[in-house]
Every structure is written in C-alpha cells, then in structure tokens.
A protein has these predicted regions:
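Short beta->alpha connector loops at strand-helix junctions that form conserved
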Residues: 86, 105-109, 313
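N-terminal "arm"/small-domain region of PLP-dependent enzymes with the aminotransferase-like
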Residues: 1-30, 35, 305, 345
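Conserved coil-to-alpha-helix start sites within the AMP-binding
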Residues: 87-93
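Structured binding elements
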Residues: 100
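Phosphate-binding glycine-rich loop
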Residues: 30, 35-81, 95-97, 105, ...
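PLP-dependent aminotransferase class I/II
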Residues: 37-42, 47-54, 60, 118, ...
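Active-site phosphate-binding strand-loop segment of PLP-dependent enzymes
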Residues: 111-193, 199-201, 343
Length: 366
C-alpha cells in the first residue's frame, strides 16, 4: 500500500531526537508554559519573520483567538463581516461564526484553487472588517494586490496558515504577509506535533498581548482575569517536539517539491486535471490535489491498485448541515472543486518506486 501519509516512517527519521526532547521535558517536571514553549515561540517567530508567536492548543483556537483579540481591541464587533474563500476547510468558517461575525464567502479560481483576489473588492461592504485568506493545500493565497486592497479599505488581513508551513511570497513566509497568521500543528501537517497544537504569529504587540491573555483564561497576571478567556495552551512536550521538527521543515518541503515535480512531469491522462503549477517558493505541497469528473471511480480504482487517497473535502462549508441556512446558495467553482478533488500520496518519505506506482495507475485509468 502506498500511503497518503506515513506518519510512522516520518517520525522514525528523527526518533532519537524526539526521545531526547521528551526525556528532557520529563526530567524538568514542567509541562505547561515553560522553557520549551518559550524556545519554540522564539524559534518559530524567527522562522516566520514576525516579532511575536503565541503557542496555543490547536489551529482552530489560533483562528478564533485572532478574531477575538480584534474584538477585545474594538477593531471588530458582533455582526461585522469577514471575507473568506468559499472552498476552505470548515475550521476557518467556524472561527468566524463562533465570534458572532459574518463569513462572506468568495469563490476561488479553478486554476489556482485559492481565493479569487479579483472578486474580493466587490465583496466589500461598510460592515467588512477583514479578509481571512487560506493557503489551502500548501499553495500561496496572497499577492500584492490583496495586500493593497486591504490597506486601501482599512481591513485586517488574516492568514489561515494551517497547511502552508514554510511557503513564501517574494521571500516573506506565510504568517508574516498580513496582520496576523494562524498556524495548525496537527500531526499530519508539514510541521506536525504528536497531538493537537497551534500558534498565532504577528508583529502587532498589542494584539499579541491580548491573545496571550485570552488563551490563558483571560489572565495577564496569575489569578487576575482581565478578559473572559479560554484554556488554549500548548504542552511542553509538543513544543519540544515541534522545535526538533522545525530544523528539518525546509528540507522536508524540498522533498515534497521534488515529488510534486515528478507528478507534474509524469501524470498524463486526459481524464485528469492538475492544478496550475506554482514556483516552489509558492507551494509547499501539504497535499497534491488532482481533479477528475469520475473522482469516486478513480479513488476506488487507486485503492484496488494499492494507493491510498483522500478527498479534501467532500462537502463544501455552504452545504454542511451545521450551516443549513446556506444550503441553497450556489458557488459553482467551489462545488466543482469539491466534486472532483482527490489528494494523492504526498509526503517526504514517498519513494520513487511508490511514486511511479501512483503515476502508472493514474495514467492507465480509463
């Protein structure tokens, strides 16, 4: 079986370093908000290129805390609108609605799969307070035009970087392109913990201070609570593991890019559409999506041939039961993506032989 993601093989590459990190935490006797968190926050902020990094419990919390922070600072209020791509993962939408804000869904482009920046400006209303761009599949969802639009209209530009660790635009990493970035370290990410973990990156000192307090029950001083906060803290164990993994992130991304280059060169089937190829700096290939009108048949065929795949994602947010008031809306490009997308094996431990198996099966699909 060619696995979509072989976490065991990925983990065993640096097992001794992980064991040493875990041993260090155990021997310290300190498991929350300690030296490991401080070290990872410093190293990740330096890697991303921001002044601040706040380690939190998961990627969804990171998204929620950015928006909540802006509400506490008076930048946003209940009922304000946030522009967001219609084809994003549900977490992006949940963070907005959980903050009593209104998601304004904007279509992606079919070629690029990311937010159609040319449609952003027409979606702006007097109630719009921000844009949440999502670097889906590891592909950049930013350009200078988006930055200019947000500046011109006084909007906060927030990045969902859950799938884009290490991706850059003109030398600037995702998470440093806008006003704040939310990061997920779910185990399957390019930079993944051994459990759930997340972070917020920003240059905004005031926002960082508020988010740090909100994530710690709303407290800036022990047992003194300025805000109605939440419990969203990264464990010392996960911080220690992530700091080990961070050293290898760029190398791992290069291996993903090499695999993607082979897929682009070798996949040749008129029934299969590949997304527009980007420069390597603009894509860290969290997933490698392919598209087929007979997607379900293709997935069953690949499974029979010993290739594991996954759909990202079978149901778009506006068709989910939890947002049933949106179910009658029509977003044709989003729906086409969700009807045809199939993710094939993409990670740094896929061998050339395994990649050839994947390509051979795809090319022979009829």
């Amino acid at each position: 079986m060619v696995k979509l993601l072989d976490l065991q093989a990925i983990t065993m590459q640096h097992a001794e370093e992980y064991e040493a990190a875990v041993k260090r935490v155990i021997e310290s006797g300190w498991f929350l908000q300690g030296r490991e968190n401080e070290t990872f926050e410093r190293d990740y902020a330096q890697y991303i290129g921001t002044k601040h990094c706040i380690a939190v419990a998961n990627g969804l919390d990171a998204l929620k805390l950015i928006l909540r922070g802006y509400k506490e600072l008076g930048v946003m209020k209940d009922g304000d609108e946030i522009i967001v791509p219609a084809n994003t993962y549900i977490a992006t939408i949940l963070a907005i609605t959980d903050n009593q804000l209104v998601p304004v869904l904007v279509e992606p482009t079919w070629e690029h799969l990311e937010l159609d920046i040319n449609k952003v400006e027409e979606a702006i209303t007097p109630r719009t307070k921000g844009v949440m761009t999502v670097h889906l599949y590891g592909r950049i969802a930013y350009n200078d035009k988006l930055g200019d639009i947000c500046k011109r209209h006084g909007l906060k530009l927030m990045e969902d970087c859950a799938q884009s660790h290490g991706c850059t635009w003109e030398g600037v990493r995702t998470g440093a392109l806008g006003n704040a970035g939310a990061h997920s370290f779910y185990p399957g990410k390019n930079l993944g913990a051994f459990g759930d973990a997340g972070a917020v990156t920003t240059d905004d000192e005031e926002l960082a201070s508020v988010i740090r307090a909100l994530a710690n029950y709303g407290s800036q001083k022990k047992y003194v609570f300025r805000y109605v906060g939440m419990n969203s803290r990264m464990s010392e164990l996960d911080a220690a593991i992530l700091d080990v993994k961070l050293k290898y992130l760029d190398e791992d991304n290069r291996k993903r890019q090499q695999l993607a280059a082979y897929y682009y060169e070798a996949i040749d089937n008129p029934l299969i559409t590949l997304p527009q190829r980007l420069n390597d700096e603009n894509n860290v290939y969290h997933q490698f999506p392919i598209f087929c009108e007979r997607r379900d048949e293709l997935q069953a065929y690949l499974k029979e041939g010993g290739v594991q795949t996954l759909i990202h994602y079978p149901i778009p947010p506006h068709k989910q039961e939890c947002y049933k008031e949106w179910n009658n809306r029509s977003y044709p490009i989003t729906e086409r993506i969700h009807q045809q997308e199939l993710s094939i094996p993409m990670n740094q431990v896929v061998s050339r032989e395994e990649a050839e198996t994947v390509v051979g099966l795809i090319n022979n699909f009829r």
